[in-house]
Amino acid sequence: MNTPYEDIYTLFYDRVINDKRFFLTGILSQEEAEDIARQRSKSLLLESIVYIQTYGTKDCEVNFIGDRDDDLEEFTFELSLVEKQLIADVMLQKYLEKDITLRLNALGQVFEDSDLKVFSPYNDIKYFNLALTELRTLNDTSIDRYKSRDRESFKQKISIFNYEFD
């Protein structure tokens, strides 16, 4: 059975539900906002599966990149809940990585040099960066764990001299 991208979008939306900037609430019509959120989600999903597929030295048992149909917006195999959650978590990371750039640009446009001497947004940016770094670390650990387990049984693979056994 195939897995629609929508299954993963829903998990991702749960992570950013309060972010009005992602959903553009109050700015566009409901339909326009949903279309843009869907386009952004698809872009983040594609970035995320490339990241998961290419991260680290271990191979994935499945081909997230090749085994998908972008026209039908679905993977051509059934993803496990672990895989769906992992992709949604990396989507959040990719979204926040873009968000930090937007925040820095916005601060540069809002504050004059004299304002920055009185009010420094450094702490806000510092804590945002720390949280993003922690999320990256958690996601990278999750990817390593995912790749070190059998996809069907979720049992740990045993690696001896770079040979893997089930």
Provide a role label for each language-model segment.
Residues S120-Q156, I160:
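Polybasic, proline/glycine-rich intrinsically disordered low-complexity segments
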Residues M1-L79, R145-D166:
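Conserved short "hinge" loops at termini or chain/domain junctions
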Residues T57, E61, L96-G108:
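Short, solvent-exposed secondary-structure capping/transition elements
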Residues K84-D89, D113-Y127, K157-D166:
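A short, terminal or domain-edge coil/loop segment
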Residues S80-I100:
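Elongated alpha-helical scaffolds
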Residues I65-L81, Q109-P121, I125:
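Short, exposed interaction segments that mediate macromolecular assembly or regulatory contacts
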